[in-house]
Amino acid sequence: MKPCVFTGSAVAIVSPFCGDGVDLEAFDRLIERQIQGGTDAIVVCGTTGEAATLSYNERMALIERCVRTVDRRVPVIAGSGTNSTASSIALSKAAQSAGVDALLTVTPYYNKASQSGLVQHFSAIADAVDVPVILYNVPARTGIGCTVQTYQALAKHPNIVGVKEASDNFDLIQDTLNLCPPGFTVWSGNDGSTAAIMALGGKGVISVAANVVPREMHELTQLCLKNRFLEAGALQLKLHELIRALFCEVNPIPVKAAMELLGLCSGELRLPLCRISERHLEQLSHALEPFRPAV
């Protein structure tokens, strides 16, 4: 049986900026807040962490800082996927050397590889490292998605342990859970689908919302893991308006704005991402109100 890197809620943590650089002191504070809030794992340098506009040195600084600050209290998962297999391998090796517990590798964007190309790409990354590799399927952002046949082929690799499924394609998710071996784990990649995917057999979520409400996302996944789905459904519904507001514009624009509204870190983004519109900021502020005592 393959190792399950984590069960529960892993935060796809934001990368706080200060001027032209990353704010590592603010990053430390965000990590501590996550651990105190019950977060089960931390994903650094993912989509929410604006990996696409980080330099290599910035990515490595954030990964190394996360490993050091977490200090083995929860698993650290580094986003190491790019649209270049060679670059992904180099970044994956460097992240492994920094001490991460696992890697999150997105489907290569823009190139629009065939399914055979995806199998070869992910296999080459997994061949190059010893830590577990989690696939990341998010076709709305990358322009290409994995099929269940691709998952079946990749599940045979000893280092490839599962997938962050952000397609919201429930036929694909159910086929994956039915047809891939039991040790191939599925995690939700969409906050709003967490309870539904876990009811089918998923083991948790890699969460944007956990940046704002870590305790609630942890509680939601724990209820699911304990098969208390009536209570989990009620909590999922309670979170619905907040989750919707966190995706009123492209991620991570709203969550960065939410972090600033709550005084947690700067809402600064890097172009081509820009600040949230006034209309959506008002929507977000309203959605945050029920959770302000909890943050």
Pin down the residues of each PLM region.
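C-terminal alpha-helical cap/extension of soluble enzyme domains
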Residues: 8-16, 37-39, 199-202, 206-295
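Catalytic alpha/beta core domains of metabolic enzymes, predominantly
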Residues: 127-128, 139-247
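Short helix-capping segments at alpha-helix termini
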Residues: 68-74, 98-99, 129-131, 156-159, ...
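A generic alpha-helix structural signal
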Residues: 28-31, 63, 92, 122, ...
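Active-site beta->alpha loop and helix N-cap motifs at the rims of alpha/beta catalytic domains
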Residues: 2-11, 15-143, 151
